[in-house]
Amino acid sequence: MKKEQRIKKNREFSAVFKKGSSMANRQFVLYVLPKEGQDRLRLGLSVSKRVGNAVCRNRIKRLVRAAFHELEGQLRPDCDYVVIARNPARDLSFKEVRSSLEHVMKKAKVLAPLYGNRKKDS
């Protein structure tokens, strides 16, 4: 994901937590905040120290970013997304991470094939 597609600032995370809606499963919590006039989705990641050491936390973040990259064409582009990884996420493979994120995105009604028409920047 490109730098402009990342949520980094504390106030941006806070805005998504306060104004956005949330959906969860055993592995992840997904917060979604629709934003008018935004043409690219933005992603913020949070993995607590309780989940594991730095190597484990960074692995989870890499897997989540890769899953979002694959699903980007099916996601609403006018939203900010924040993913919080829970403890069970540390033992998942990439396929399981992707499947779990797809599940929580479908629950949040942000994953749909109709958003797949937009072009990706390479």
Curated annotation (Swiss-Prot):
Name of the top EC class for this enzyme: hydrolase
Catalytic activity, EC: 3.1.26.5
Gene Ontology molecular function: 3'-tRNA processing endoribonuclease activity; ribonuclease P activity; tRNA binding
Record keywords: Endonuclease, Hydrolase, Nuclease, RNA-binding, tRNA processing
Cellular-component GO terms for this entry: ribonuclease P complex
One of the protein's GO biological processes: tRNA 5'-leader removal
Keyword tRNA processing appears in the UniProt entry: yes
Gene3D superfamilies linked: 3.30.230.10
NCBIfam families (alphabetical): rnpA (TIGR00188)
Function: RNaseP catalyzes the removal of the 5'-leader sequence from pre-tRNA to produce the mature 5'-terminus. It can also cleave other RNA substrates such as 4.5S RNA. The protein component plays an auxiliary but essential role in vivo by binding to the 5'-leader sequence and broadening the substrate specificity of the ribozyme.
Subunit structure, interactors included: Consists of a catalytic RNA component (M1 or rnpB) and a protein subunit.
Family statement drawn from the similarity comment of this UniProt entry: Belongs to the RnpA family.
Official protein name in the record: Ribonuclease P protein component
Classification lineage: Bacteria, Bacillati, Bacillota, Bacilli, Bacillales
